[in-house]
């Protein structure tokens, strides 16, 4: 009898959806990526490419849960922000996975937002400054933080700044990104 009850509970839970999720959509972002060290004498930054996809689970008009997967690729050109030569650098070549929550002002046409979460970065990270030296490959954790604006009648265009703090390699990877949200059928 217990086995039948366990099987019925498992089957019922497979068909029951989360009741607090009102809408689902997919957000795709592309942008210019930048990596900077936490501490630097020469004020260096490496430029590159950023790409990310998020599953948007809207709980209320002002709160969303967003699991994400993305990619960040930045390369140093050996120069500082004033275009002078520098021995310091910070580079990221990583696949990003994690989850974050977004709090937004539910305003039509223009809705400001902020989000925070936790995630993992899988790849190669190099930070070379006069204060620290890290050359790591593998899996490290990151803390994502973003803010920006959702634009349009249905707030389906996203313009924002997104940051990934990597404390274990003392660097910050960020991006100026533009995104498009595509509704999914329930």
Positions of PLM-derived features:
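Structural signature of outer-membrane beta-barrel channels/translocons
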Residues: 21, 56-58, 102-108, 121, ...
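Sec-dependent N-terminal signal peptides
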Residues: 3-14
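Membrane-embedded beta-strand positions of outer-membrane beta-barrel proteins
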Residues: 28-32, 53, 65-69, 99, ...
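Short glycine/proline- and aromatic-enriched beta-strand/turn motifs that initiate or cap beta-hairpins
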Residues: 18-59, 64-65, 173-186
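Positively charged n-region of N-terminal signal peptides that target proteins for export
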Residues: 1-4, 19
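Predominantly the C-terminal beta-signal and adjacent terminal strand-loop region
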Residues: 72-79, 141-186
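Flexible, solvent-exposed loop segments that connect beta-strands
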Residues: 34-44, 70-95, 122-141, 176
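Outer-membrane beta-barrel pore domains and translocons
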Residues: 31-37, 70-74, 117-123, 162-166, ...
